[in-house]
A protein has these predicted regions:
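Surface-exposed extracellular loop regions of Gram-negative outer-membrane beta-barrel proteins
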Residues: 159-183, 192-198, 281-296, 384-392
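Outer membrane beta-barrel transmembrane domains
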Residues: 132-141, 239-515
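Bacterial Sec-dependent N-terminal signal peptides
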Residues: 1-32, 516
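Outer-membrane beta-barrel proteins
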Residues: 80-96, 147, 178-192, 257-259, ...
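Outer-membrane beta-barrel "beta-signal"
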Residues: 28-37, 205, 504-516
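Transmembrane beta-barrel strand/turn architecture of Gram-negative outer membrane proteins
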Residues: 93-115, 192-215, 308-329, 408-419
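N-terminal, post-signal peptide beta-strand-biased segments of exported outer-membrane/organellar beta-barrel
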Residues: 22-117, 121-123
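Outer-membrane beta-barrel translocator/channel fold
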Residues: 116-154, 213, 220-223, 228, ...
């Protein structure tokens, strides 16, 4: 662990020094507050931020703020009464460090880099012993005892873009890793590595940039479960397979709980990006990934195979008339997941051959989002309102015993904010109330042999997914520009949540940052 932390610290420090050196050569700190305002406006719509995503190599090639670095320290406090979803637990405190930088070395070459490190403790985790369980769902390890989990996460990303007239090409890479462990039985120790490489080619017209982007992803997780005394362990680990089903053959706390997940996938998208703060942005994306769950002590026999596909498209449009800017966003996405359970032999010859592959699990997803924007600007200030409505629908089915779970919900929000700039100061205030209503939910469970403890877990999961909730987020940011070092800022974000069964939550995030 100490070696990992040392490597992280050295890498972050080198990134910081490199950013300072580059910035001292090519940057001017006069317009840092203006660039911060541009960043606020550029990410007003959720879909617009997609063109600047770390996984897209060329998204920053013609950004409105070509030279910008930011170092951010933040920590969060959570005062939720109890975990809403026991599988995630609750995080009372977490700390985070972020560093990002975009540097234009010359008129043709632009670089981007970033790093993140965070540390937290998840309290009272139950019915989940696997990291990234939402991504691996429904195939993850779980038990009814649980406990606290220590969690570390770090990531590094970098990109290179080269322009030649109206054409450009770019390459990028991103590496994410996490370490999650428990100190009381059951003691999971999960190590995750997630790497993606992408390339982009594009064309710049007078008002837009068009790009084709391709990315390849490699995901691995090694799960090592330990007990002080397995013979007297008070927990049974289940390899869940969907809607309360599990691999009865591999249940227990012995050799079957050592697991490895291997995922390989790719992403392809077409993007059209406006080169100004108004105009049209649009994109279409397809991604898929295949994830195998391997039993380590059974000669890496594949217990399950999960295939995930997702397609999405979005269009955003802005128009300006004097000091008035207005716009709209429409986004639609659909996904389908297919799960296969493998039947293997008894391993007498240590081969553990797969004898049959059974398609048992299906999940269909649909998401739609519509939002608008009205922004009124004056010389030193601006006010904006952005209402939005989102619809989500999913249907899970399990083949035998026949089970299904369907959820449909609508969510509305109203984001409103105020931006004020005077001399070297910048003030940003934003409020976003959200209300989500589940208008359709149904659970069909024909499994008469399901263990009572798992049945209670399934009922609780269904209750959570069908729950209505209200949340309100208020954010305040104050930024002050200095001539030699850049801009220093402080940001406070407070969220109040209230759920149907009386659970309340309070979250406070405090960030201090330097922009240069």
């Amino acid at each position: 662990m100490s070696r990992i932390l040392k490597n992280i610290a050295v890498s972050l420090w080198l990134l910081f020094i490199a950013s300072l050196i580059c910035s001292s050569k090519v940057r001017n700190v006069k317009n840092l507050n203006l660039r911060s305002v541009q960043e606020i406006y550029a990410n007003m719509f959720a879909a617009d931020s997609r063109v600047l995503d770390d996984d897209i190599a060329g998204g920053f090639a013609y950004s409105m703020y070509p030279n910008l670095s930011k170092i951010n320290f933040s920590f969060g406090l959570n005062d939720t009464q109890k975990p809403l979803d026991e599988r995630n637990g609750k995080t009372n405190f977490n700390g985070r460090f972020d560093a990002t930088s975009i540097v234009q070395l010359n008129p043709k070459i632009k670089l981007r880099g970033g790093a993140t490190y965070s540390r937290s403790v998840k309290k009272s985790v139950k019915w989940n012993s696997t990291s990234d369980f939402e991504f691996l769902y429904p195939y993850f390890l779980a038990d009814s005892v649980g406990g606290d989990r220590h969690y570390e996460y770090y990531s590094f990303n970098g990109a290179y873009a080269h322009t030649a007239g109206r054409l450009f090409y770019a390459f990028s890479g991103k590496y994410k890793a996490s370490h999650e462990w428990g100190e009381v039985d059951p003691r999971p120790r999960n190590i995750v590595s997630d790497m993606s490489l992408s390339t982009s080619v594009g064309y710049k017209s007078r008002k837009h940039m068009f790009s084709l982007n391709m990315a390849y992803r490699v995901y691995n997780q090694d799960q090592n479960m330990r007990f002080v005394n397995p013979d007297g362990a008070n927990a049974i680990e289940w390899h869940l397979t969907g809607i309360g089903s599990h691999y009865a053959r591999f249940a227990g706390n012995g050799i079957y709980i050592f697991t490895r997940y291997e995922g390989r996938g790719y992403t392809a998208n077409l993007l059209m990006q406006s080169l100004s703060k108004t105009g049209l942005n649009a994109g279409i994306t397809y991604n898929n990934i295949a994830i195998n769950r391997l039993l380590v002590n059974q000669n890496y026999t594949p217990a399950t195979n999960l295939y995930k596909h997702r397609a999405e498209t979005f269009v955003t449009y802005r128009r300006q008339s004097g000091g008035l800017i207005y716009g709209a966003e429409v986004a639609v996405a659909a996904g389908f997941h297919r799960g296969i359970e493998n039947i293997s032999d008894n391993g007498i010859t240590d081969n553990f051959k797969v004898l049959a592959r059974l398609p048992m699990y299906k999940e269909n997803l649909f998401d739609g989002r519509v939002s608008g924007l009205v922004q009124m600007t004056w010389r030193r200030s601006a006010v904006y309102f952005s209402p939005g409505v989102e619809f989500n629908r999913k249907l899970e089915t399990y083949k035998f015993p026949a089970k299904s779970m369907s959820i449909a919900r609508g969510t509305g929000n109203l984001k409103c904010g105020f931006v004020f700039s005077i001399e070297k100061w910048l003030l940003h205030i934003e409020e976003k109330p959200v209300y989500s209503y589940c208008y359709k939910s149904k659970l069909v469970n024909n499994d008469e042999l399901m263990e009572p403890v798992i049945r209670r877990c399934l009922d609780r999961q269904f209750q959570i997914e069908a729950m209505n909730f209200f949340a309100n987020n208020i954010r305040l940011s104050v930024q002050r520009q200095f001539q030699k070092i850049g801009s220093l800022g402080l940001s406070l974000s407070w969220t109040h949540s209230r759920f149907l069964d009386g659970v309340k939550g309070e979250n406070l995030y405090i960030s201090t940052y330097l922009i240069f």
